[in-house]
Amino acid sequence: MTTRLLYETDPYLSKFDATVTQVEGEWVELDRTAFFPGGGGQDADRGWIEDLEVTEVKGGDDIKHKVPDHAFTVGQRVEAEIDWERRHDLMRGHTAEHLLFSTMHKINPELELVKISITPEKKCFFVKGEVNWNLVSRAQQEANGAIAAQLPVTHVWASKDSEAVKQVRIKAERIHGDKVRIVSIGEIDKAACAGVHVQNTRELRMLLVTKLTSARAKGGDVEVEFLTGRDAMDKALVLSAYALQAAESLGSVPDDILSSLTNLKAEEERSRETLRSYAKESIARLQPVRLGDLHLVSGVFQGIDKKTLMDAANEHAKKAKTAVVLASVDERTLLVVASSPDLELDCREVLNSAMAVLGGKGGGSKCFATGGAAGMERSGQAVAKAIEEIKVRFAAK
C-alpha cells in the first residue's frame, strides 16, 4: 500500500490522524502522513506519533517513521504531529535557496548548482563557477526585493517530457518516474524540486549570505551559506556592528572599509618585501662556525617566509662539508636543516630531535628537511637542539 503524502497538497499541515499499515521493529508505516522524508537537499521531518518521538523518516513508495519504544499494531488509529517550528525553518531555507541561486545565476549564467544542504543547523548550497562578494551582494539585493514583493510560491506536476519541463532548472538524471514537480517563485524562478516550500516569499522576511568557502583546488566548488528570517536579521545587526568597529579602528568610515583594508594590505606587503630583502641579505652574510672539518651555519630570523629560508639553506649547503640550521619565528616556528652531500649527516634525524622540542612535525630527505610548529616560545631551544645533535654526530667520528 502506497502512503498518501499529505505534505504534497498541504505543506502547512502539522497535525493529522492515520492508520498503522505496517510495523517492522522500530519502523512504522501509516496509510497517510505529513512527515516529509527529505529530498532536494532538505532534511527529513521530526515529530511525534501518539506523543512518542519520531527520530527518523525514510522515503519511498511507503514512508517509514522510526519510533523507538513504540507498541503500535497494524490497524491502530494514531494521532501524529510534525515539529512545525523545525519544518517551517526548513521550508523557508529551501525556498530561499531557490531564490538566491536564481538571482546569482541571472548575474552569472555560467553558474552550475552542484549540491544543496538545508538542515536546522546550516543552510547552504554549492555552485561551480565564478562567485565573489560583488555578485553575492547584487544577488542578495534582488532576492530581498523579491521577498518584499511578496511573490507567490506555487507548484504543479508535469510530464517529464513536456514543454513545461524544458523551461525549468532540472537535473534530469535525478528524476525518477514520469512526473516532475515544478516549483515556481513568481516569474523569477522555476525549478524541478521534491522539497516542501513556503507559499509566499514574505515568509522569508530577509535573506543574508554569511559565508563563501572556495574549494582549495582551482576551479572547485564554492559553498554559499545563508540565513533567513529572524536569524538573518540578528546576524546582519551583529555584522553591522563589526563593520562600524572595524571602520573606527581603521580611522575610516564603513563605506571606505574595503579601500582602507586594500591600502593596509598593500602597505603590509611592502613591509614584508622589505623584510624579505633584509632577511636574504642577512642570511647570505651568515658566517659558518668551524667545528673541526665541519662548517656550521645557523641563525634565527623573525617573520621570514618559507621559500626565502629554504632557498638560503640550499645556497649555504652547496659549500663543501657544510651543515645548516635556520629558523623563522612568527606565529609559527619554521625550521630547516640542510647539509652538503659530502657530509655523512641525516638531516631528517636532526630535524626530528628538534621537532620533539617544538612539539611539531616535519620531514624531507637525507640532505634537506623542514618542519614547523605553532608558537615561537621554544624556537631557540629547538635550534640549539639541532646544533647539539650535529655536534654529537661529528664528535663521535
Question: PLM ranges: what are they?
Answer:
Residues 1-76:
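Conserved nucleotide-binding/hydrolysis modules and their immediate coupling elements
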Residues 20-34, 75-88, 175-190, 344-361, ...:
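Short, hydrophobic/aliphatic alpha-helical segments
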Residues 28-30, 60-70, 122-129, 336, ...:
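A generic structural motif
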Residues 34-49, 73-126, 367:
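Active/ligand-binding-proximal structured segments within catalytic/core domains
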Residues 41, 186-203, 211, 217, ...:
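Glycine-rich, acidic loop segments that terminate in or are immediately followed by a histidine
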Residues 198, 203-258:
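A conserved active-site cap/scaffold subdomain adjacent to cofactor or substrate pockets
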Residues 244-331, 339:
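Hydrophobic helix-and-loop "lid/oligomerization" segment in the mid-to-C-terminal part
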